[in-house]
Regions:
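A mature extracytoplasmic/lumenal domain signature
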Residues: 69, 437-439, 512-514, 522-524, ...
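Aromatic-lined ligand-binding clefts that engage carbohydrates, nucleic acids, or primary amines
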Residues: 498-518, 552
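Bacterial N-terminal signal peptides
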Residues: 1-6
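Glycoside hydrolase catalytic-domain context in secreted enzymes
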Residues: 11-492, 499, 535, 543-546
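Short beta-strand-plus-loop segments that form exposed binding edges in beta-rich domains
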Residues: 553-563
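A general secondary-structure signal for short beta-strands and their flanking turns/coil
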Residues: 491-493, 503, 513, 537, ...
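Solvent-exposed beta-strand/loop surfaces of large extracellular or lumenal domains
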Residues: 520-540
């Protein structure tokens, strides 16, 4: 939650470093308690959202809790990308997994230093609280996020999860290297389309035997410092307001000492009429969450599922939420920031620099993990590697030259990505390499619009994601194609003409990680500007006549995503 004008509080002076919460000799609990005691109710409310603003009068910098690290630092530009989570789990190698997570945590520290504000503040995807691992059990291939998990086995999920958490959090007795987050708690395995309204009723046997073991293991053995509560309801009660899950199991039975953050938009699910509608009003929903174990709200701005801090203040003033509960949550949150060393001058991670990401040593670790994850490849008769270079090689399939296939989801931007096709060409430079997409992943193959079909194309680039203001550059273009840098917000608009090679029905989309729109013949063919969960594969159709030229306009934007985006 960002600082909202009615609740913003500005002060002129910052406190001396000698105040108790700045004293590293005191315990994190003592320091956090001292800090929270100095805040007004309005200031407290502002600190309970994922984008916590600075409190200048207390010398507290802003902090954004939202950071992704499923298989490497994600959405923060160039970083080492490891295999997707389900591939790493296939190794059954807990030592390798812990070492991998240690590399990832080093890169998180480097990325934090790279963009750290002078006062120590951090921005979106530049913090040290990592929202991984995903411990949900993957038993239905129709769930589109199964690749984020460690598979179908609760025991394996727990062991791999523990290793990942230990690698992320480190082994220093006083400070966390980063904070890991076991998610999504609990009983959450799709379907995606109904995730904000789903109400699940697992049997006690399934709950204890399938859905909870990995979470229990990462709390009791892995000592994970954070838990993310789910969108869905369990037994009629929203996950983020579910005392059975968050108080009975998590804290009473398992002894969890950390904080609970909502999945993004899940707090709004508690009260929204188009979601779980568990309470009648937003203040009542906020109260239900905090009183039953939730400590931090992640708001989903893209889908309008935010929970403004005014609702927290209103809940307290109406008697729905006690200020003591607010203080309890804030103390947990500030203990976490203190244990990350965000207020202290000397840390055990001082040897990490802002350049310690995307290094050759880290690339080697990623390659080793990728090799270890190939457990279903049977090299019968020692066919590979080829004894001699073939004269002709056919590379067929929609994943052969796909960047998306390499990085999966929740990914960083590799500095030197190599697709299957790239690798074969490099390995056999003198061979004749034939490539065909063949089919699409979920339908006919999608082909890029050829340069020859486009005429007079010009592109305008903007230094913001909304095509706002004057363009930073305008130039001729051969195609509606862009390779955006991976660590900035920008947008572009292409205009020109399109000539159809044949008469027929054509489908168009833009292979964007974020939003896009396509107009043909001044008709809006596809509009995915407000895409909620990128990437989208939505396309639109229009009938075109052979040889006729049509006005074409394509718009797209990125928010820290990678490039290689084009009109299909």
């Amino acid at each position: 939650l960002s600082s909202i004008a009615p609740l913003s509080v500005a002060y002129a002076q910052t406190p001396p470093a000698a105040l108790p919460y700045r004293n590293p000799q005191l315990s994190p609990a003592e320091r956090a308690r001292d800090l929270v005691s100095k805040m007004s109710l309005e200031e407290k409310a502002l600190q309970l959202g994922h984008d916590a603003p600075a409190l200048p009068r207390l010398g507290i910098p802003k902090y954004n809790w939202w950071n992704e690290g499923l298989h490497g630092v994600a959405r923060a530009g160039i970083a080492t990308v490891f295999p997707q989570a389900i591939g790493m789990a296939a190794t059954w190698d807990v030592d390798r997994m812990r070492n991998t997570a240690d590399v990832i945590s080093t890169e998180f520290r480097a990325k934090y230093l790279e963009r750290r504000h002078p006062d120590g503040g951090s921005d979106f995807y530049r913090g040290l609280t990592v929202w991984s691992p995903n411990l949900n059990i993957f038993r239905d291939p129709r769930w589109g996020r199964g690749q984020e998990t460690y598979g179908e086995d609760p025991y394996l999920t727990g062991r791999i999860g523990i290793a990942f958490i230990r690698g992320l959090q480190g082994d220093d007795p006083k400070y966390y290297k980063t904070i890991a987050t076991s998610k999504h708690f609990a009983v959450h395995s799709g379907p995606e389309s109904n995730r904000h309204r789903e109400d699940v009723y697992p049997s006690l046997h399934d709950l204890e035997d399938t859905y909870l073991p990995a979470f229990r293991a990462t709390v009791t053995e892995g000592k994970v410092a954070s838990i993310m509560c789910v969108y869905n309801a369990v037994w009629g009660v929203p996950g983020c307001a579910n005392a059975v899950l968050q108080e009975h199991y998590l804290r009473r039975d398992w002894g969890f000492q950390g904080y609970v953050v909502s999945d993004c938009g899940a707090a709004a699910n508690i009260y929204r009429k188009d979601a779980l509608a568990y309470t009648n009003t937003a203040p009542e929903g906020v109260a239900a969450g905090f009183e039953n174990g939730m400590d931090l709200i992640c708001g989903d701005y893209r889908n309008g599922m935010t929970t403004d801090p005014e609702n927290i203040v209103a809940a307290v003033k109406a008697g729905h939420l006690s200020e003591a509960t607010v203080d309890r949550s804030l103390q947990r949150l500030f203990e976490a920031r203190i244990r990350l060393g965000l207020f202290d001058p000397q840390l055990p991670f001082a040897n990490i620099t802002a350049k310690d990401y995307d290094t050759p040593a880290h690339h080697a670790k990623s390659r080793e993990m990728a090799q270890a994850s190939m457990v279903l490849l049977k090299n019968q008769g020692n066919l590979l590697p080829f004894k001699s270079a073939p004269r002709t090689i056919a590379v067929i399939g929609p994943n052969a030259d796909s960047f998306d296939t390499l990085v999966g989801n929740y990914y960083g931007t590799p500095s030197k990505p190599v697709t299957v096709l790239d690798g074969i060409r490099a390995r056999y430079p003198n061979a004749r390499i034939l490539h065909a997409q063949g089919v699409g992943l979920i339908g006919p193959a999608e082909a890029p619009v050829p340069d020859t079909a486009l005429r007079g194309l010009r592109v305008q680039h903007y230094a913001n994601p909304g095509l706002q203001g004057a363009p930073t550059s305008t130039e001729a273009a051969a195609n509606a194609r862009v390779e955006w840098a991976g660590d900035r917000e920008s947008s572009a608009r292409w205009t020109g003409t399109l000539t159809a090679p044949e008469t027929g029905e054509y489908r168009f989309r833009f292979s964007s990680e974020n939003g896009y729109r396509v107009w043909i013949d001044n008709k809006l063919v596809v509009d995915e500007w407000g895409v909620g969960d990128a990437p989208s594969i939505l396309s639109g159709s229009i009938r075109l006549k052979r040889g006729k030229s049509y006005a074409v306009r394509v718009e797209g934007f990125q928010r820290g995503a990678r490039g290689q985006q084009q009109l299909l």
